[in-house]
């Protein structure tokens, strides 16, 4: 009897947009092509936004054929655009739902202001951190996004901005996922969006990476030479309260350890860190909470950003009264901290801070 080895299924071709630049460079040189072709292809992908290999007209036909044999070229599909215009808004906040090449769904948000157009980008499909006030955490982690998929969000949002005669001026990594659990791809995307070779050419100082406090990666950023800004979701200077709100982040990186990394970051970069503090009624809004927050933040250069709780489906915290928030802010300012109260945009379409969760969680998209 003859036995045959079953054929293993072939791996699906790689989407060219998902390659990091060094991976693209290696693939091109493996084809026997000169290295400058990698730069040309990268510009076709991210500056000209080519949708096919045939469109890359400056490349030799033989190279385009090799690319088509080895790779696919798939762009995200815009599934839905929702708008929210709260009282007094000049322009609507807009949220885009994108479907990626493997079917994963992510959201990104365009936030307008008088002098700025801010793109709020996701770094992961879902999130593993399980913060109790955040809708994204209910999804769990599906996967990291590639640098190309991060860039595609910026491209899509800039298209909306261009409809109003504007362009993106600022980027915040405050969408779905924890950026510092996908640091390599986030940094690769930042390198592209801040490069002079590409259309937007954003200043790195206009880009903010927001984290729950992944200490080893904060230390990595402090050594990286990046000029981006850092925001840290703190939400309580009491370890036991922070563990209730952010169980994974607080347990892995307790407040004293996080403080040391922020102090080192501030000294290494000379930059003030933004401490993000979501005020929750009866949880972290007392005078003692304000006192502990001020004491905690004395160890590093920072500004404090107070934000309102935005309701999500799974857990109902209470919002803080305006008078209570004003007292909290006044105390911190009396302690010589720069304190701002962030205005929430997009709550009516679940686009505000902590509300991003793909529509797959609310209804099925066919």
UniProtKB/Swiss-Prot annotation:
Key word 4Fe-4S present: yes
Binding residues for S-adenosyl-L-methionine: 177-178, 210, 233-235, 310
Disulfide bonds: 120-353
Annotated compartments: Cytoplasm
Pfam families for the chain: Radical_SAM (PF04055), RlmN_N (PF21016)
An example Gene Ontology biological process: rRNA base methylation
Cofactor binding, note field: Binds 1 [4Fe-4S] cluster. The cluster is coordinated with 3 cysteines and an exchangeable S-adenosyl-L-methionine.
InterPro entries: Aldolase_TIM (IPR013785), Methyltransferase_A (IPR040072), RlmN_N (IPR048641), RNA_MTrfase_RlmN (IPR027492), rRNA_lsu_MTrfase_RlmN/Cfr (IPR004383), rSAM (IPR007197)
Single GO cellular component term: cytoplasm
Positions contributing to [4Fe-4S] cluster binding: 127, 131, 134
Enzyme class: transferase
Keywords: 4Fe-4S, Cytoplasm, Disulfide bond, Iron, Iron-sulfur, Metal-binding, Methyltransferase, rRNA processing, S-adenosyl-L-methionine, Transferase, tRNA processing
GO molecular function, one term: 4 iron, 4 sulfur cluster binding
Domain of life, per lineage: Bacteria
UniProt EC number: 2.1.1.192
Domain Radical SAM core per the UniProt entry, residue ranges: 113-342
Protein's job: Specifically methylates position 2 of adenine 2503 in 23S rRNA and position 2 of adenine 37 in tRNAs.
Note: Reaction proceeds by a ping-pong mechanism involving intermediate methylation of a conserved cysteine residue.
Assigned protein family: Belongs to the radical SAM superfamily. RlmN family.
PANTHER family with a match to the protein in the record: 23S RRNA METHYLTRANSFERASE, RADICAL SAM CORE DOMAIN-CONTAINING PROTEIN
Name of this protein: Probable dual-specificity RNA methyltransferase RlmN
């Amino acid at each position: 009897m003859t036995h045959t080895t079953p054929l293993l299924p072939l791996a699906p071709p790689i989407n060219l947009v998902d390659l990091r630049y060094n991976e693209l460079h290696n693939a091109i040189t493996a084809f026997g092509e000169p290295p400058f072709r990698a730069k040309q292809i990268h510009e076709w992908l991210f500056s000209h936004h080519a949708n096919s290999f045939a469109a890359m007209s400056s490349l030799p036909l033989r190279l385009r054929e090799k690319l088509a044999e080895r790779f696919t070229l798939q762009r995200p599909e815009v599934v839905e655009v929702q708008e929210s215009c709260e009282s007094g808004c000049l322009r609507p906040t807009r949220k885009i739902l994108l479907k990626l090449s493997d079917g994963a769904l992510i959201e990104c948000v365009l936030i307008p202001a008088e002098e700025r157009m801010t793109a709020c980008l996701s770094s992961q499909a879902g999130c593993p951190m399980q913060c109790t006030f955040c809708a994204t955490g209910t999804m769990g982690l599906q996967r990291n996004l590639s640098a190309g998929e991060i860039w595609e969000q910026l491209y899509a949002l800039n298209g909306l901005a261009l409809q109003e005669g504007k362009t993106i001026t600022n980027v915040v990594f405050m969408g779905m996922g924890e950026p510092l659990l996908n640091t390599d791809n986030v940094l690769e995307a930042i390198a592209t969006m801040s490069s002079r070779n590409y259309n937007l050419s954003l200043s790195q100082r206009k880009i903010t990476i927001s984290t729950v406090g992944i200490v080893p990666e904060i230390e990595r950023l402090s050594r990286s030479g990046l000029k981006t800004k850092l925001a840290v979701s703190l939400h309580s200077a009491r370890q036991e309260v922070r563990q209730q709100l952010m169980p994974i982040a607080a347990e892995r990186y307790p407040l004293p350890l996080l403080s040391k990394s922020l102090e080192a970051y501030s000294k290494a970069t000379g930059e003030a860190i933004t401490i993000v503090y979501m005020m929750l009624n009866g949880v972290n809004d007392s005078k003692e909470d304000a006192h502990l927050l001020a004491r905690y933040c004395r160890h590093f250069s920072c500004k404090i950003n107070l934000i309102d709780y935005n309701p999500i489906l799974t857990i109902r915290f209470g919002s803080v009264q305006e008078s209570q928030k004003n007292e909290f802010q006044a105390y911190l300012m009396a302690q010589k901290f720069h304190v701002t109260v962030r205005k929430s945009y997009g709550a009516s379409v679940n686009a505000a801070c902590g509300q991003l969760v793909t529509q797959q969680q609310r209804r099925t998209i066919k």
